Structures are given as structure tokens and as C-alpha cells.
Amino acid sequence: MLTNRLALTLFTLTTIAMAAPPALLASGNDDDTRCSNRTLRGDFAFHIEGAFVDAPMPLLIRGVAMTRFDGRGRLSQVDHVVFNGMLPPVDWTPATGTYHINADCTGEAEIIIPGSPFSPVTLRLVVGADGRRIETVVSKPGYDVTSTAVKVDSSR
């Protein structure tokens, strides 16, 4: 009988924990773990690397970008991306786009590069370090590309 009661108690506690919103299960202050579009505001310097694999032979990709997030779901950027050692047709390629950040600090972005055969670029991302760091992966068939960004200190 004690075993049944213990099993029922464990089952009840497990059910409650599974049904509880993730914010209730997090340790620490809720404000420390909650994200939204407002979490990304300002300029971020990106380092990009990977490969375009939807070709007879993979094309290596290396680049940098400066992206400005407006805190409301819109972004603008310039990038310099080298494909297999070939310089881009425009030194600093401009782009615009949108992004959405979920409460758990995951999100997505879409970048539109006018005139580019690679546009749009669809990203999945994770925001960390209180909105000061971003990790991304291109979420589009044929790409194996990741990037890391840090917020640019505008106080200088």
C-alpha cells in the first residue's frame, strides 16, 4: 500500500511538473531567461563560416557581417562573404530582413539580399549572454553554414 501511495505521489508530481509552464520550472529570476524581439537591439558583428553543399563540389563560405536589429523584428545589414576564395561582386553587400525571438531565446530570421541567387537566407538562432551574443545556423537546403555574433559596444 505504501508503494502504491509513493508511486501515485511521484506520478502526480511528474504530471504537474510536465504540465507547468517552463518559466515556472526555471531557476532564478524569470526576467533573466525571458526573451523577445526587444532582446535584440543595436549592432552585432557576425563571423560566418561553412559550405554551400548543393553543388558538384562543396563551396567553402567565409565572411563577416554587421547587422542592426531594431528591437521590433526588423534588421538591416552589410556583409562581405567569400565563396571558395572568390570575392563577392559588391564589397559590402546590403540586405534587409525580419526576425522573431521566442520567450525561450530561440528564434528565426529571414535576410533578403537584393539580386542574389542565394536570397532569401533563412536562419535559426539562439540568443545568449543577456542579448549580447547570437548563434545561428542557415536553415535552408544545400547549406552547412553557421555564424556567431557579439553585440558591438556603442559607448566608444
Where are the model-predicted features located?
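Bacterial N-terminal signal peptides
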Residues: 9-19
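Bacterial N-terminal signal peptides that target proteins for export
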Residues: 1-11
